[in-house]
Swiss-Prot record:
<dbReference type="InterPro" id="IPR030382">
    <property type="entry name" value="MeTrfase_TRM5/TYW2"/>
</dbReference>
<feature type="transit peptide" description="Mitochondrion">
    <location>
        <begin position="1"/>
        <end position="57"/>
    </location>
</feature>
<keyword id="KW-0809">Transit peptide</keyword>
<keyword id="KW-0819">tRNA processing</keyword>
<keyword id="KW-0949">S-adenosyl-L-methionine</keyword>
<dbReference type="Pfam" id="PF02475">
    <property type="entry name" value="TRM5-TYW2_MTfase"/>
</dbReference>
<dbReference type="GO" id="GO:0005759">
    <property type="term" value="C:mitochondrial matrix"/>
</dbReference>
<comment type="subunit">
    <text>Monomer.</text>
</comment>
<comment type="function">
    <text>Involved in mitochondrial tRNA methylation. Specifically methylates the N1 position of guanosine-37 in various tRNAs. Methylation is not dependent on the nature of the nucleoside 5' of the target nucleoside. This is the first step in the biosynthesis of wybutosine (yW), a modified base adjacent to the anticodon of tRNAs and required for accurate decoding.</text>
</comment>
<keyword id="KW-0539">Nucleus</keyword>
<protein>
    <recommendedName>
        <fullName>tRNA (guanine(37)-N(1))-methyltransferase</fullName>
        <ecNumber>2.1.1.228</ecNumber>
    </recommendedName>
</protein>
<keyword id="KW-0963">Cytoplasm</keyword>
<comment type="similarity">
    <text>Belongs to the class I-like SAM-binding methyltransferase superfamily. TRM5/TYW2 family.</text>
</comment>
<keyword id="KW-0489">Methyltransferase</keyword>
<feature type="binding site">
    <location>
        <position position="387"/>
    </location>
    <ligand>
        <name>S-adenosyl-L-methionine</name>
    </ligand>
</feature>
<dbReference type="Pfam" id="PF25133">
    <property type="entry name" value="TYW2_N_2"/>
</dbReference>
<keyword id="KW-0496">Mitochondrion</keyword>
């Protein structure tokens, strides 16, 4: 039984107070007698007026405990197992705290109640009072505010200054599909205990998901939820195989939305256009693209062996570097040409459509012969990027004895940035050993390894950076007249070395 009394505290506002919650075990015949006795006692007390007994008081509720309903903003339980999205099934009414205020002070008050106000998708934090046109109701966060004592000291001070009672009332708020977050919807729909897909890679208007087997029965619903809950997304696709073909693109299925895969993305100030279904693009590599770009300075030369649509080549060309970019995929080659023109670097980038090995042993070899024969004052720094993590290490064999004649000074030897995946417990050591095995040398003392990102559990993407040793690059070595004594191999100058145990992690967006 709940007993309510109205108490007028000194000089502020009226309050409803619950005296105590009683568990009645006596005979029902005793209840009226006890009630009558308590009524007489309270009526004699000054300043206290008895209102009556209620099981629930809708406008000024009983003081609540600090126990919170963790499922308050969860969708209805009967949506569990839904495979075809029915938005109407997500309607739900919840009881939340509100604060009644005069409409003319709402703007001033809301600046001070940001912490306490309810924040839910599609829900206004201030609504009209259905019983008073001159008042407004501020919806409060039920996980933060459950009695007037839940307000912070600063908030109470503002309320008092504006002559607003901190008395909390309840309001029945109707929630719909629009008011739930994507993660809340998917958690309610998928079987309990299963992983929920709430993240994806955004490629222009396309949401690219990698669904797991247990999520496939819900794939159409998941795709539609991603479109509904992410402004600008009009198509959701799922990768249905690994990137294992010669062109580095993957087969995908459209889960929901439009079939159009022609898209435009902006990365690090540059714009790229392409058909996402026919080329490779990974938005999670934007930080890595910037990292490599920062290593080059004006006048340097870049050979991009697996250039894709240009995320390395174009930013580097913008730094007034000379770029030679290659990709075997005819679609990537087409969009690389297009994007170079789009970003106004087409005069600084020479583009090829060759196999990576043919590119290295053809155009790269020819250019290196010219570049490395220049005088010391004119020699640029030469970088070779090989971003094909599944196979790039295999292409390192193309550097063995690539050049004839007299080696250049060690400081001008080309710098290679080669990407690879590793599932080894020590991925940096693994990549060094595999790259060294292909080249026929040890790279332990003359390379650095950068951890690019975690691809999957126990699978890392890394970049090993090193200068190609003269013993590898040149077929017939003779004494270099510029160097009376060839110094031992050293770590290359432009990439930061680190220990195998403390691999630096680059965060990607």
């Amino acid at each position: 039984m709940v007993l309510w009394i109205l108490w007028r505290p000194f000089g502020f506002s009226r309050r409803l107070l619950k005296l105590e919650r009683h568990s009645i075990t006596e005979s029902k015949s005793l209840i009226p007698l006890a009630w009558t006795s308590l009524t007489q006692t309270l009526s004699e007390s000054p300043g206290i007026f008895l209102l009556g007994q209620r099981k629930r008081f809708s406008t000024m509720p009983e003081i609540e405990t600090h126990e919170r309903d963790s499922e308050l903003f969860s969708p209805p339980s009967d949506v569990r197992g839904m495979t075809k999205l029915d938005r109407t099934a997500f309607k739900k009414t919840v009881n939340i705290p509100v604060l009644k205020v005069r409409k003319e002070i709402v703007s001033r008050l809301m600046r001070s109640l940001r912490r306490a106000a309810l924040q839910r998708p599609g829900i206004k934090r201030v609504i009209e009072d259905p019983e008073d046109k001159e008042s407004r109701l501020i919806l409060l966060d039920p996980y933060k505010i459950f009695t007037h004592d839940s307000f912070e000291k600063a908030e109470l001070s503002v309320l008092e200054q504006l002559n607003v009672s901190p008395q909390i009332s309840k309001y029945n708020l109707e929630l719909t599909y629009e008011n739930f977050k994507s993660e809340e919807i998917l958690r309610a729909v998928l079987p309990e205990g299963q992983d929920v897909t709430s993240g994806f890679s955004r490629v222009g208007h396309i949401a690219h998901l990698n669904l797991r087997d247990h999520q496939l029965p819900f794939k159409q619903l998941i795709g539609q939820v991603m479109i509904d809950k992410n402004p600008g997304i009009t198509s959701a696709v799922n990768k249905i195989n690994n990137i294992d073909n010669m062109y580095r693109n993957f087969h995908m299925e459209v889960l929901s939305g439009e079939q159009n895969m022609m898209t435009k993305v902006r990365e690090n100030k540059y714009t790229y256009e392409f058909d996402f279904s026919k080329v490779y693009w990974n938005p999670r590599l934007s930080t890595e693209h910037s990292r490599i770009t920062e290593l080059l300075k004006a006048g340097d030369v870049l050979f991009d062996v697996f250039a894709g649509v240009g995320p390395f080549a174009i930013p580097v060309a913008k730094k007034n570097c000379t770029v030679f970019a290659n990709d075997l995929n005819p679609e990537s080659h087409k969009w690389l040409l297009h994007n170079c023109k789009l970003n106004k670097v087409d005069q600084k980038v020479k583009i090829f459509n060759l196999d990576g090995k043919d590119f290295l042993q053809g155009p790269v070899k020819e250019e290196l012969i010219q570049l490395l024969s220049l005088s010391k004052e004119r020699k640029p720094s030469v970088h070779i990027v090989m971003n094909l993590p599944a196979k790039a290490i295999e292409f390192l064999s193309a550097f063995k004895w690539l050049l004839d004649g007299q080696p250049c000074s060690n400081e001008f030897l080309p710098i290679v940035h080669c990407y690879s995946f590793s599932k080894d417990a020590n991925p940096a050591k693994d990549v060094r050993q595999r790259a060294g095995a292909v080249l026929g040398i040890s790279l332990e003392a003359c390379s650095s390894v950068h951890l690019v990102r975690n691809v999957a559990p126990n699978k890392e993407m890394l970049c090993i950076t090193f200068q190609i040793p003269a013993a590898v690059l040149y077929k017939n070595q003779t004494k270099n007249p510029e160097n009376h004594e060839d110094p031992p191999l050293k770590r290359q100058r432009t990439a930061e070395a680190f220990s195998d145990e403390k691999t630096q992690i680059a965060s990607n967006t």
